[in-house]
Each structure stands twice: as C-alpha cells, then as structure tokens.
Amino acid sequence: MKRAVVVFSGGQDSTTCLIQALQQYDEVHCITFDYGQRHRAEIDVARELAIQLGAKAHKVLDVGMLNELAVSSLTRDNIPVPSYSEEGEDSIPSTFVPGRNILFLTLAAIYAYQVQAQAVITGVCETDFSGYPDCRDEFVKALNHAIDLGIGRDIAFITPLMWLDKAETWALADYYQQLDRIRHDTLTCYNGIQGDGCGQCAACHLRAKGLEFYLANKPKVILSLKQKTGLV
C-alpha cells in the first residue's frame, strides 16, 4: 500500500499538495504543527480541510519550543508583519522562522516511519517564495539524505511545487477541480485571515498576483504546468 504524510498548514500550497496526494496514494496522513504562530487560525482551517478532503488521519503536534527559540514576526506579537512593499528583495524577511522546516520535516519523517509511509510531501517552493533558505531544493535534499541515514529507512521527501510559480500552483488546483476551495477555504495570510486574506502581507500579495495571472492566461499557464509536471 502506498502511504504518504503531508506537512499540512491549511494554506494554499499544502492543501494543493494534499489534494494531489489523495489522487496518487492509497492512504494519506496529515501532520500540522502548533508553534504559537501569529496566524494560529490556520490550525482549525487545516483540521476542517483534512476532514473535508478525506485524509486517513490528521495529527496536530505541539511544538511550542520553536516559538521560544525562533524570533520572527510570526512568533512575536511585538514584531509587526511587514507589508509586501516593505520586504527587501535581497534580505531574509522578518517572517522567516529559523529552523521551522528543519523541525517540521524531521518530525514528519518520524511520523511517516510510525505509519509506514514511503513519502513525506511538503509544499515548499523555490520559484515563487519569500527568500526563506529552508524552502530551497538543495536544503530539502540534504535533510532528506541525513534523515534517511539517521532512521535507517528510505523516506522520500516529495516537493510537488518546488519549480512551479504561484500561477502554476493555482493551475494545479484547477486541474483537480479545486480552485474555488483553495481560494475560499484555505488560509495563507500571515495575519490569519482566511480566503483572500488581508491583501497586504507578502503571502497574500504573492497568492493574489499568481491568481490574477492565472485567470488572465489560463491556456499558457496550464501548458507550462503540464510541461513541468507531466500531467496530461
């Protein structure tokens, strides 16, 4: 039986990954992390979506120690979330949570070991991202190798969105006839607003810009998606 664990935040990217995984695996488990994040409403959104979409199980882990160690505008109320216009192109933004994906992927791999899953799926992306170093393909592959050595089992880290831009990610949701669900029911906003979000933070800006481009250029974006992914 093919099993996978999806690192699931209830946002656009991880929900799109879950939708695809449910088509590709016999059994899909979700794992969500509560680290005292500013946009903590995402946890309830993730719970509801996991039920609606039909995940086999959904585990929510308390990793509050990350909040204690990692100083970020997503973990500290006294550090404001910058608007997309305030973020510098060449610097790591204040929304970066140091060590987050190191911890999340490690714990997801342990969970995968427990449920005998062959894959851990994460929605990180290097094409359209906010400059987070732990979203890079190089990082994911390096950590995957280290974890395989450390647990003595091959668990593949799968990154379906790694080389897709946001418009292509919208196209992928549309391919599975889930664009409206992704738009209205997910929570990507750093300020914790479901759907189209606050419209001001970098996450909302990237998401809205991608949707606008996709809706205006559907045939072109769908063709690009199929060329990159092999979907027919």
From Swiss-Prot:
- Name a GO molecular-function annotation: ligase activity, forming carbon-nitrogen bonds
Q: What is its EC number?
A: 6.3.4.20
Ordered alphabetically, the record's keywords are:
ATP-binding, Ligase, Metal-binding, Nucleotide-binding, Queuosine biosynthesis, Zinc
Query: Record's InterPro entries?
Result: QueC, Rossmann-like_a/b/a_fold
Q: Which cofactor does it need?
A: Zn(2+)
Keyword Magnesium assigned to the entry: answer is: no
Hey, which pathway is this one from? Purine metabolism; 7-cyano-7-deazaguanine biosynthesis
Q: Which residues bind Zn(2+)?
A: C189, C198, C201, C204
Catalysed conversion reaction: 7-carboxy-7-deazaguanine + NH4(+) + ATP = 7-cyano-7-deazaguanine + ADP + phosphate + H2O + H(+)
Give me any GO biological process, just one.
Answer: queuosine biosynthetic process
Give the binding site residues for ATP: F8, S9, G10, G11, Q12, D13, S14, T15, T16, C17, L18
Q: What does this protein do?
A: Catalyzes the ATP-dependent conversion of 7-carboxy-7-deazaguanine (CDG) to 7-cyano-7-deazaguanine (preQ(0)).
Know the name of this protein?
7-cyano-7-deazaguanine synthase
Q: Which gene encodes it?
A: queC
